[in-house]
Amino acid sequence: MISYVAAVSKNGVIGREGGLPWHISSDLKRFRDITMGKPVVMGRKTWESLPRRPLPGRRNIVITRRRDFASEGAEVAASPEEALRLCAGVPEMAVIGGGEIYRLFWPLVDRLYLTEVDLEVDGDTHFPAVSPGEWRETERELHLKAERDTASFTLRILDRMTKK
């Protein structure tokens, strides 16, 4: 199964200048819980934006067109197809961004773990549009803004009803 893990603003933004335009502590814990023990697939820019590399307890697979790219703790894939081969036989792989990588895997994704952030923000990276007719919501949980959080948010799990 191919899953996406993403935090998305009300206007579809997932990033700004190589980082997240918000801070939500409990969402970072949820991200860790969802991805722990699974291969995480990301683009080079997402890899470079991580405060700690590699993400511990997970295979870190970085998709990049840079033939000379190497980084300790990262397995490198030149294409989505190569990343899929590296993940062959695993029950679930988690695609964690960025925008270009989400677009490349979009026809193949089975599940979305979304954190919908109750903000409209400026940003330079966006999440693909989610068509309601393609997805069935299996879980929804509202969280009000905590003291150290930027905003309230809703945690959702959506499963694709039919593949493209």
Predicted region positions:
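Enzymes that bind and transform nitrogen-containing heteroaromatic metabolites
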Residues: 1-164
